[in-house]
Amino acid sequence: MINYTSTFTLNRQKYHYIDLVKASKDYDIELDSLPYTIKILLESLLRKHDDICVTKNNIETLFHYNSKAPQGEVPFKPSRVILQDFTGVPVVVDLASMRDAVVENGGSPDLINPEIPVDLVIDHSVQVDFFGNQDAFDANIDLEFERNNERYEFLKWAEKTFENYRAVPPATGIIHQVNLEFLSDVIINKDGFLYPDSMFGTDSHTTMINGIGVLGWGVGGIEAEAAMLGEASYFPIPEVIGVRLYGELPKVATATDLALKVTQKLRLENVVGKFVEFFGPGLAGLSLADRATVANMAPEYGATCGYFPIDDETLNYMKLTNRSAEHIALTKEYAKRNHLYHDMTNLPSYTKIVEIDLSAIKPSISGPKRPQDLIELGQAKEEFQASLVRQFGVRGFGLGADELAKKATVHFDDGQELEVKTGHVAIAAITSCTNTSNPYVLLSAGLLAKKAVERGLSVAKTVKTSLAPGSKVVTAYLRKSGLQPYLDKLGFNLVGYGCTTCIGNSGDLVPEVAKAVQEKDLLVSAVLSGNRNFEGRVNPLVKANFLASPPLVVAYALAGTTNIDLTSKPLGYDKNGQAVYLEDIMPAKEEVLSYIEQFVTAELFEEEYGHVFSDSQKWNQIETENSKNYQWNQVSTYIQNPPYFENLTNTENKIDLSALKVLAKFGDSVTTDHISPAGNIARNSPAARYLEENGVTYAEFNSYGSRRGNHEVMMRGTFANIRIKNELADGKIGGYTKYEGEILPIYEAAMNYKKNGVSTIVIAGKDYGMGSSRDWAAKGANLLGVKVVLAESFERIHRSNLVMMGILPLQFLDGQTAESLQLTGYETYTVELPEQPQVHDIVKVKATSKEGTKEFQVLLRFDADADIRYYQNGGILPMVVRKKLNGG
């Protein structure tokens, strides 16, 4: 094994590092011909080279990277892992369960400990129950701790018992913003040895960290657990798409508008499973916060990551966010020596180059059901109206032409009566790390609110307004600048530091509005500064959801409707009866920049992050036991020991793939929200019945996301989204299917199949599993007895999660679909999987019905050799436990 370590001295300190320049000479390649992300992967392989997980062949293959047709796979070990609590609780539950399994099989509980640093940020549990007043924040936090006491006690136990594990307490910030502003070192200095920060996160928007020059992406909790326990993550060497940015953003456009445009454009380029790198002269004009907004939305454009290389702006941001001067100097020196510092004169070899003219970006929103459906602001009214009557699907609601005329009169207790019409803005939320990490758009929203209040405008009480920033720094500069009182005046009071509306924790609508929506079947809207707007995600009563920049969120709240052209119609009328237009109160770019210069300072970051792990008194007061193994509470409805290790043996699993029945048949764009919802638990659902049988009242249901530590709730919640459309349910929308001629909840049908020893298959269209990195979408399917998913295409993370839970992902061959093969879903299926399957094998499937048997071929979506090992072990979790017990 050749040693490629080099040394340099900076400020009289000696540092060591893996020298890519030295290694590239040995392999006779031009280092600067490689994309930055490939160089980061190479450094990792050289550093982790052990001839077991990482071989010389892996290194050679990557050094000779062929951008036009990459071959081979990467065994990648990230530097660290970050968790949020919705996905983090099941990760810690699995670790605790692994400890039990190890002990039961004669091993030590200490075999199960994270081998790399792990940070858990608790941000997904706070809900917007209270809003629109000064007490909302405290009231929501009190309720959050009350609802989640069991979960928080469990996470506190984990902090005490596991090595290499820290928890950022509730009411501190949003995972990706805290990661960007505080947790990431960009370049890690471990006892004088330097290497790039790289990471996995159990949240798809982990990609935000690529804005600061750190390679990272979202993985399922299962893959994160494996990485934490020392396993490499195997994936095909990716294509790298270069996105050349040129020109300059117009004064009226924001980073949000750019991110939405990038999402639209790259979705059309089909960058799923590919790396994206941004370069070009336009890069210099983008602040780091702008880059982070674009990087955050990589899951929406489908890429594994959207990477911005380290440059002067990276260092400026590190200084702003109070990283030490010594570490900033070290970051620059290391990045330059290892050719990881952006070089404008060099063009790496990309698979393809896509060009985006920044000067052509216009104020926009996206919706009503997908982030990639971009609408220029001037066309928003026209597009909203068209979506109402367009055929039901990802861009339409399939309603009648009379829908626009629908309205209801809302009666308030104080005697006030207000009219609510189709398109009413029921929710206006400044939310999500995507935008609240960006001072430009937050201060723009504050300045717009100031000008609106000064003109006498107000927001109707039928609109639920909220402000939930991703860090305390945001509220600090909004207060310091004097803008928060104006936001408060319009109802955008602080409701919490967490994901809230962006992930479906929007709370109930204004009760009077909710009543009107249900009684009149009104189609109402949400406008949020989030990153996802899939149907049913934001609020079950809100069908049309639009992503917008924070200033546009405030503007739509003032207008009160999405059935309006904000570029030509007034938002309202001032105290003199004069019309007030958006252009009248939208702040000028120079004004916003002057506020940033005055009020966004390193001192704020120092103050707010100085004691981030110990500041929360509520968290500090939680008492927990001191034990290596968790003492499971059998009556808990939040935390239960999952059954993944009940049949743990040393033999590999043989899985019968004959006589499979179809549990569900879906169309295109089925998201992980559809498969495993995170939001409210519907009153008439199987999960609700389980909770009620265990003494939980409706008021205490909490959300699916908060109950991910209990497999009994989660398996009942699988395919239970109220908006999911199963083609086997005779037109009934929601989590239903046909079982022996009867329409049943999918959970009940699955249990009937299991009771009778029948395994199942799910059939789907394109982009199956798009959206959040939700491992429960695979875990739940596994517990329901699903053995195979056959789809036209898969989103990257979900395909990986399926394999890691022992579910076989099969893909229709190009040009074939369930429809073209005339598959109804009422057949019985047999998959002829070879005894020794290989990556991307073509396998035969038989579908038998009364009419006879159809045979067709499909693509086996094992994308790496590791997938085969995971599948043959019944999943990665049993495999890891076996390895630990065998001294691996």
Curated annotation (Swiss-Prot):
This is Aconitate hydratase A. Its cofactor is [4Fe-4S] cluster. CDD domains: AcnA_IRP, AcnA_IRP_Swivel. Keywords: 4Fe-4S, Iron, Iron-sulfur, Lyase, Metal-binding, RNA-binding, Tricarboxylic acid cycle. Belongs to the aconitase/IPM isomerase family. Coiled coil: none annotated. Pathway: Carbohydrate metabolism; tricarboxylic acid cycle; isocitrate from oxaloacetate: step 2/2; Organic acid metabolism; propanoate degradation. It catalyses: citrate = D-threo-isocitrate; (2S,3R)-3-hydroxybutane-1,2,3-tricarboxylate = 2-methyl-cis-aconitate + H2O. InterPro entries: AcnA_IRP_Swivel (IPR044137), Acnase/IPM_dHydase_lsu_aba_1/3 (IPR015931), Acoase/IPM_deHydtase_lsu_aba (IPR001030), Aconitase/3IPM_dehydase_swvl (IPR015928), Aconitase/IRP2 (IPR006249), Aconitase_4Fe-4S_BS (IPR018136), Aconitase_4Fe-4S_dom (IPR036008), AconitaseA/IPMdHydase_ssu_swvl (IPR000573). Monomer. Binds 1 [4Fe-4S] cluster per subunit. The gene is acn. Involved in the catabolism of short chain fatty acids (SCFA) via the tricarboxylic acid (TCA)(acetyl degradation route) and probably the 2-methylcitrate cycle I (propionate degradation route). Catalyzes the reversible isomerization of citrate to isocitrate via cis-aconitate. Could catalyze the hydration of 2-methyl-cis-aconitate to yield (2R,3S)-2-methylisocitrate. The apo form of AcnA functions as a RNA-binding regulatory protein. The keyword Membrane does not apply. [4Fe-4S] cluster binds at residues 433, 499, 502.
